[in-house]
From Swiss-Prot:
It comes from Chlamydia muridarum (strain MoPn / Nigg). Keywords: Cell inner membrane, Cell membrane, Membrane, Protein transport, Translocation, Transmembrane, Transmembrane helix, Transport. The chain crosses the membrane at residues 17-37, 75-95, 120-140, 163-183, 195-215, 230-250, 287-307, 326-346, 386-406, 412-432. One of its GO terms (biological process) is intracellular protein transmembrane transport. It is a multi-pass membrane protein. The central subunit of the protein translocation channel SecYEG. Consists of two halves formed by TMs 1-5 and 6-10. These two domains form a lateral gate at the front which open onto the bilayer between TMs 2 and 7, and are clamped together by SecE at the back. The channel is closed by both a pore ring composed of hydrophobic SecY resides and a short helix (helix 2A) on the extracellular side of the membrane which forms a plug. The plug probably moves laterally to allow the channel to open. The ring and the pore may move independently. Belongs to the SecY/SEC61-alpha family. This is Protein translocase subunit SecY.
Amino acid sequence: MATLRQVFSISELRQKIFFTFSLLALCRIGVFIPVPGINGDRAVAYFNQLLGSSQNLFQLADIFSGGAFAQMTVIALGVVPYISASIIVQLLVVFMPTLQREMREAPDQGKRKLGRMTRLFTLLLACVQSLLFAKFALRMNLVVPGIVLPAMLSLKLFGIPCVFYLTTVVVMTTGTLLLMWIGEQISDKGIGNGISLIITLGMLASFPSVLGSIFNKLNLGSQDPSEFGIVSLLVLCAVFVFVLMATVLIIEGVRKVPVQHARRIIGRREVLGGGSYLPLKVNYAGVIPVIFASSLLMFPATIGQFLSSESSWLKRIATMLSPGSVVYSIFYVLLIIFFTYFWTATQFRPEQIASEMKKNGAFIPGIRQGKPTQSYLEYTMNRVTLLGAVFLAVVAILPSILGRILRVDANVSYFLGGTAMLIVVGVVLDTMKQIDAFLLVRRYDGVLKKDRPKGRR
């Protein structure tokens, strides 16, 4: 209670929190606004039947969108196009020397340029996905011309309902762009990472349905190991606790590199250098690799699923990339490891750290300053990142294993077993750290209470 009073006693922090929650509430309103021309009840019934059948791609998409996908609403695409666009732009930076040079010479201008490129790619990807979404809705007979704008939605050109396609593309693309704008506003003026908070909000919104699935499937009196009984429930709870602890451990874990400071002369006095350490995070990328890997696999799989009835090879691709399959699991693990290294390489700057240490007279015992320090930091970070990447992949892949062993619905295993839990816990910890830093600047005890010297009030 004392911490909450501290949080809300600071006017600026209180305004940031209120601003963040207000925009997140606006996101949830979009879940209840259907795409014009689509029968919402028929769509929900169809997806309920589909989602209850097996571990399907649409289950993961529905969790990411907070239930908007199954209801076919204006924000059904969620922020997946934005995340895919961010991946494309980050890869372009790596493979285009001109962008790298611009980022080094004018970081602010480079960031603005990357932001414009990300928005452009988001627009293009959202248009493509919403077009496929409209085609899928027509094929599944989920469109009822006459629900909204009866005259316009019934118009056809060469037998193709062009107005319906145009309406769906405009509405759903606008929904994605609105979510992107909200995420950027939260990151700039609120608390936490806006896009990550939107994803987390959608996942938390599916928690009641997860609990409902557990209790509907639970059969306490059954002795059949193939049914979901008390033993399966206890195993599920144990896995939930393990994933929770492992997530906190992997996100908060650091490798402490000892640092010694040289003697300095201040005025006429010689001050002895003290010892400290440089913390290298075990998982420097946080939950970014999980979000990137899930979104990247979701994009081609969604296209294959939408067009599977028109091509046998697309149907095979959709089946292979369906969550829970062996191919999906292999790609998922490899992508998590790749994006962990990729994000660490783009964000961790050993040459800058080595340069700052040399300027401040700091050194690592047994390692010369300058280039040797940079090489040592790169070597150490690569080893630490490997451990973090493998651990992250193991925790993230638990849902498919859990679903097969315990025979629970995919939404339960996704939420309690790995992917969703990693994202939710990681984003919550990151947001708490931002609030903690905000409080410490003003000499308050942080939200994440640790033993630390207190400043004067």
